[in-house]
From Swiss-Prot:
This is Protein Fer3. Signal peptide: none annotated. GO terms for cellular component: nucleus. Residues 1-24, 56-82, 145-175 are annotated as: Disordered. It comes from Drosophila melanogaster. It is found in: Nucleus. GO terms for molecular function: DNA-binding transcription factor activity; DNA-binding transcription factor activity, RNA polymerase II-specific; protein dimerization activity; RNA polymerase II transcription regulatory region sequence-specific DNA binding. InterPro entries: bHLH_dom, E-box_TF_Regulators, HLH_DNA-bd_sf. Residues 86-138 form the bHLH domain. Transcription factor that binds to the E-box and functions as inhibitor of transcription. DNA binding requires dimerization with an E protein. Inhibits transcription activation by ASCL1/MASH1 by sequestering E proteins.
Amino acid sequence: MQHPHPIDQPTYMPDVPFQPLWGQEAPPPPIVPYQELIAGFPCTDLSLWQRSQVTPLVPQRPSTNGRANGSSSSSKKTRRRVASMAQRRAANIRERRRMFNLNEAFDKLRRKVPTFAYEKRLSRIETLRLAITYIGFMAELLSGTPSNSHKSRSDVYGSMNGHHQAPPPAIHPHHLHPAAAYQRDFASPYNHSLS
């Protein structure tokens, strides 16, 4: 004799092993905005329909095996739970892809900004600060005019981390290597030298 699943124990989708959605050599599919996605549907203002207008269009399923409304409500809960699990998985995949792209972009930026060979891997904020300093240095080098705003710039960056530092010495930045400019403008939040 077969026993049906108890109502209080919902059935879940079995765990599906992670597989890439596309081949490693192919780029990921483009992300389509919601408005473009629903543009192909005949009626885009579905939210304007009232429930009383939509209800007659949806067929009512008769209860099977003479069960009461309790079983139909449990199947709705299971369906809703399965849908939410699928939505969570899709959101997790999107978040993983976003973080992967973000980390990849930071790695590319780290390869472009000048650093010392023996330096540890820069954090994201250190990478961004070094890139800002390097871009500023290169702009000053191209224009031939040194910037006189070093004090305000270091105060801004120091306060971003909650650390305050003494104003940098009056050195012309076009005489410095970009890595030296980085050391001049940004003190380590851990009170140790980056070199």
